[in-house]
Design a protein with these regions (language model features):
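Noncatalytic alpha-helical scaffold of FAD-dependent oxidoreductases
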Residues: 1-219
Length: 219
C-alpha cells in the first residue's frame, strides 16, 4: 500500500490447477513461535502459509456461525500456521504433510500439527481464515483492531524478530494487536487495538504508525 509503479508490459504465467490439496495446521503457544517457524516450513515448498492468532481463533470459537468449524484446533493455541500443499495424489500429499509434522516435532516448533486431506475439513479452516476480519471488528467497546499499519512485508526469514519488535512497540503504547495474514511471503495484517473516539486514541494511532514505519525500514 502506498507503492507507485508504472507497468508498460507484463507477461503472466498460467499454471494448472492442482488435482488435490492438503493442509497441515501447526499449533503454537504464541505468535512469536509461529513467526520463527515460517522460514523452516518454507523448506517444504508449500503453496501457502497463513497465520492466525488467538484473537481470530477465540472469536471464531464464540461465533455461532463458525464454532462448528473449529474442530481442527487442539488445545488453546496462541497462534496457528495453516500450511497448504498441492499434489496429484493422496499418497503424495500424505507424505508431504507427514514430513512437515515430523520436521516441526524434530525442530521443536509448535506443540501439535493437524494434517487434513479431506476437502470439507479444509474448507472449514479456510472459512475461519476468510471471516477473521469481520470477527475482529466485532470486538466490543470503542477500541477496535484498526488497519493503519496493514500489509507490512519483511523477509520471512526475519519474521520472528520483526513480530517481536512490532509487539514491543504496540505494548509500549498500552495496547495489543491482532495478527493474521500471508506468512509465506512475510506480508502480515497486523491491527493494533485503538479507539478513534478520543484525541488520546488518535495520538496513539499516529505514534504507533510512525514507529512501525521506522521499524519496517530496519528490515
Amino acid at each position: 500500500e502506498g507503492t507507485l509503479c508504472v507497468i508498460t508490459e507484463i507477461k503472466i504465467n498460467l499454471v494448472p490447477r492442482p488435482t488435490m490439496t492438503a493442509l497441515g495446521v501447526v499449533h503454537f503457544q504464541d505468535i512469536f513461535g509461529a513467526s520463527d517457524a515460517v522460514q523452516h516450513i518454507l523448506e517444504h515448498d508449500p503453496s501457502s502459509i497463513e497465520i492466525m492468532d488467538s484473537n481470530v481463533l477465540e472469536r471464531s470459537r464464540q461465533s455461532a456461525g463458525l464454532a462448528s468449524n473449529m474442530g481442527f484446533i487442539e488445545g488453546n493455541p496462541g497462534a496457528v500456521l495453516v500450511v497448504e500443499f498441492y499434489g496429484e495424489s493422496e499418497t503424495e500429499l500424505t507424505a508431504k504433510t507427514n514430513e512437515l509434522k515430523e520436521d516441526m516435532a524434530r525442530r521443536g516448533h509448535g506443540y501439535a500439527t493437524v494434517n487434513m486431506l479431506d476437502r470439507a475439513a479444509q474448507a472449514s479452516v479456510w472459512a475461519v481464515r476468510k471471516n477473521g476480519l469481520g470477527l475482529l471488528m466485532s470486538m466490543r467497546g470503542d477500541a477496535k483492531p484498526l488497519p493503519f499499519v496493514e500489509d507490512t512485508a519483511v523477509d520471512p526469514d526475519r519474521m520472528g524478530d520483526f513480530v517481536r519488535k512490532f509487539d514491543e512497540i504496540v505494548r509500549n503504547h498500552q495496547t495489543e494487536a491482532a495478527y493474521y495474514g500471508h506468512a509465506s511471503v512475510g506480508c502480515l495484517h497486523i491491527r493494533p487495538v485503538v479507539s478513534l473516539k478520543s484525541q488520546e486514541g488518535v495520538n496513539k494511532m499516529v505514534s504507533i504508525a510512525d514507529e512501525i514505519s521506522d521499524l519496517v525500514k530496519e528490515f
